Structure formats: C-alpha cells, structure tokens
A protein has these predicted regions:
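Short, Lys/Arg-rich N-terminal segment immediately upstream of the first membrane anchor
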Residues: 11-28, 204, 307-311, 404-410
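Structural detector for short beta-strands of small beta-barrel domains
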Residues: 53-72, 101
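OB-fold/S1-family single-stranded nucleic acid-binding modules
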Residues: 75-77, 108-128
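Beta-strand/loop nucleic-acid-binding surfaces
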Residues: 78-94
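Short, charged beta-turn/beta-strand-edge "cap" motif at the junction between a beta-strand
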Residues: 92-94, 104-110
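Aromatic-rich juxtamembrane segments at the membrane interface
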Residues: 121-237, 242
C-alpha cells in the first residue's frame, strides 16, 4: 500500500531513514541543541518572573484594558503581565478600544479557566486611536445597521470588534472551519498590503516608495486594530516581506517566522499561552514547513500533468487546508474538545468568497474615509450580495454532519507533544522522499541523453 502511494524510491528512503544510525557528529549536534534549549528555557523563565505581576490583586491598581462590548480583557496590571487571562466588566459602557484605567479591585473570581476582576473604575484615559476606531465603526453603523449579520461581520473582519457577533454565528463559523475570517489574520494583512500596492500602482509611484507607503499603511492598520499576538505575528512577517522588497533582498519566510516569535515573546512572554497565537503559528508552520514538501511529491506524481486553472488551484487549496488542519488538530482537541474531520473541504469555496467580501469591505471603508461616499451605491449592494451568498454557504455547511466531532474531555498535554514529535518526524521523512524522487528523475533524464 505504502509503495503505491510514494513509490519504490519512497519506501527505500523510509527504510534508510528508519534504520539510520546516529554518528558521533549527529550525537554532538543533539547534545548541543539540548543544552541550548535548556539554557533558553532557564533564561525565558527568569525573564518571565521579571515581567510578571506578583503582587496581590487588591486595592487600587493601574490596568491596561482592551474593551470589547460588555467586558474588557486585562492586558497589564501596574505595567506587568498577569500569569493568566483576566477580564473586567465594562460598567462605564466604554466604546471599543484600549484604555489605561485606575481600578479599585474588590474581589477576584475564577470559574474554570476564566478570571474576572470585580471592582470599580475610578478613572480612565483612552488611546488616541479610539476616536478613529469609532469613526470607522460609525461608517458601518450608517451603512449596515439594518443588516444584522453583515453589520457584525464587517466590524469583526475590518476592526476585530466582535461584540456584535452572536454565539450562533460564531459556532457556525467554527464548525465550518472558517472562523479565521472573522478575526484579523494574515489574510487581512495580505489584503492591506496588496490593496495599497495596487492603489499606488495607479499613480505610477517609484518602486521603493510604493512599498514604503505600504509599510506605513500596514503599521497604522495593525496599531489601529491592536497588536494582539496573532496580529503582531502577521505584522512582523508582512513588514519583513515589504522590507525585503525595499532593500531588494530575497524574502525568507522561515526567518521571518522565527524573528516574529522571538519579538512577541520578548514583548509579552505570556503570548505563548494565547490560543489565537498558537493557531496562527500552527497555520503558518503548515504553510511554510509542511505544504511545500507535500506539494513537491504530488506535483511530481500528477499535479504538473494538470492544466493550470480552477481545478488545479482548488486542489492545491484543498491540500493546503488539509495540511493546516493536520497541524492544528491537537490544539482543537486540547482547547475546544473537538476533532476536525472534513471542515477543511469547505475552504475551497468559503475562503475565496470570504476574501472577496473582506476586500469589498476594506474598499468601502477606504472610500468613506476619503469622503467618496457617492460610490456607496455601487459597493454596498455588492457587499450585501456577496455576504448573502457567503452566509447561505455557511448555513448549508453547518448542516453537513461530520465536519467536526465533539470529544468527551480534554486530551492530556503529553499527547499533544507526542503528536507534534511524530509530525516533525513525518515532515522530515516526506521531505527526504521528495528529494529522493527528484534525484531519481534527474538521473533518468541524464541517462536518456
């Protein structure tokens, strides 16, 4: 069976890989890596203690809070990070945005994994960008207030403001595997960069200046929506890609990924426990480290024989979505007690429609900021039509059984580690098989000549 899938050369490569004996040099490399890893963990732990709030949560404290709806996520206490996620109630009915506030802590309540800090807001100072956030939210108020779900989607997809997104809507997006479209992600960052570059192309701007302005726009946008760990990851990788083009350097996505992780952990060591960040990195790891090796083998076997077109692109998107799902499975099992099975298939249609919808919403936002409101009569009906199709697709998808399965209880953490160790071994094997097949094809072509 294995021979039919990967061929004789693949089976032979698997045997070599399995039976390979460690040399003294390999053993030295493993020991060196282990020592560096141990030192890194010790330094990280020391740094963690330095930036963590270790005092008693009682009395008046200075909180840095992100308000979203009826609650606010506590980012810092007295300019130090909490060792756990905590929230406060938005008793002042503050609008969406970031606030520095004096807070009189009365009680701390923890239920399961959720911590609520109860008390009184005694004073606050809001971020200067909050006014601009409100300005954009008012645009959606004027245009989509009567379209309940489109109104909620536009606020979430453009600004990351999810207070209007209903539980039913969230559940449908999660079940169909399209939840990444209602949070600010790498998709949004890419659309911002591509959109700015296309706009600047129309004014015939010099190559370097085009990307310099794109970097400025990207920085402003990410600052506006808030530099959460997932957004910061996408921003750093996007910024490094733009800088590579400005400096005429080769883009290196692997290096960008590692640098983004280091920067995020230096700025906020507790970001490593953030679920959205873990899912974000899992997706990017699948795109950078898993998919290219799978695609190489499939390309040799049959993809290169297919004509370029919708069918080939759809097949590639399906394989990419499957790779992302495979890498993300342990996180879904551990945090959500769900096993994704076939939800990746809906990405074939859902992602293109959702991407076009987000592009349209970005266009509407920009046109209204530039006071070109007379174009709303064209773009708003288009957005409504696309969203209706998108919502209909998600509704039908939510009725399909077996996209995800509920699992009784959270899996143990050691299972997650074992899964990823086996996945790393599998990636190395698939990579070696791909190189072996390519070498064999080259040898055959040389013999022909």
């Amino acid at each position: 069976m294995l021979e039919k899938i990967i061929g004789k050369s693949g089976v032979e490569e698997f045997r070599k890989f399995w039976n390979k004996k460690l040399s003294l040099e390999d053993f030295k490399k493993i020991i060196s890596f282990g020592i560096l890893l141990a030192l890194g963990m010790i330094l990280f732990n020391c740094y963690l203690k330095y930036v963590t709030f270790n005092g008693e949560l009682k009395g008046e404290k200075i909180l840095y809070v992100k308000i979203d709806g009826s609650t606010g996520a506590v980012q810092k206490v007295n300019n130090k990070y909490l060792g756990k996620q905590a929230s406060i109630k938005n008793t002042k009915n503050l609008s969406y945005g970031y606030y520095l506030m004096r807070f009189d802590v009365k009680k701390v309540v923890t239920k399961k994994e959720f911590t609520t800090i109860e008390g009184k807001i005694k004073g606050y100072k809001e971020s200067k960008l909050n006014n601009f956030r409100r300005y954009i939210l008012n645009i959606f108020d004027d245009l989509f207030m009567t379209e309940e779900n489109l109104y909620a989607f536009s606020r979430a997809a453009v600004l990351g403001e999810k207070s209007e997104v209903s539980k039913d809507m969230k559940d449908k997006f999660k079940y169909t595997g399209l939840a990444h479209l209602i949070v600010i992600s790498g998709t949004h960052i890419s659309l911002v960069v591509i959109g700015i570059v296309k706009i600047l192309d129309t004014v015939n701007l010099a190559y370097k200046w085009k990307y310099i302005f794109s970097l400025i726009a990207l920085t402003l946008y990410c600052t506006l929506v808030g530099m959460s760990p997932g957004i910061l990851r996408a921003y750093i990788m996007g910024a490094m890609m733009i800088l590579a083009r400005i400096l005429f350097q080769q883009e290196d996505s692997k290096k960008s990924l590692m640098i983004s992780l280091i920067v995020i952990l230096v700025l906020n060591p507790y970001a490593i426990t953030d679920i959205s960040m873990q899912l974000s990195y899992a997706a990017v790891i699948a795109i950078i480290f898993v998919y290219p090796h799978i695609e190489r083998i499939l390309n040799i076997k049959f993809l290169e024989k297919m004509e370029n077109g919708i069918l080939k692109d759809s097949l590639k998107l399906t394989i990419l979505s499957l790779c992302i799902q495979i890498v993300s499975i342990p996180l879904f099992l551990y945090y959500f007690e769900k096993l994704p099975l076939f939800s990746f298939l809906l990405n074939i249609i859902g992602v293109p429609i959702g991407t076009v919808l987000i592009e349209t919403l970005f266009s509407i936002t920009l046109l209204n900021i530039l006071k070109l409101k007379f174009l709303n009569f064209i773009f708003v009906p288009v957005a409504q039509a696309i969203y209706n199709a998108f919502e209909g697709f998600i509704f039908m998808g939510s009725k399909i059984p077996m996209l995800q399965l509920n699992v009784a209880g959270k899996i143990d953490l050691w299972i997650v580690f074992v899964y990823y160790i086996l996945l790393i071994v599998g990636i190395i094997f698939v990579r070696n098989v791909g190189f072996e097949i390519e070498d064999e094809i080259k040898k055959r072509s040389i013999k022909k000549y």
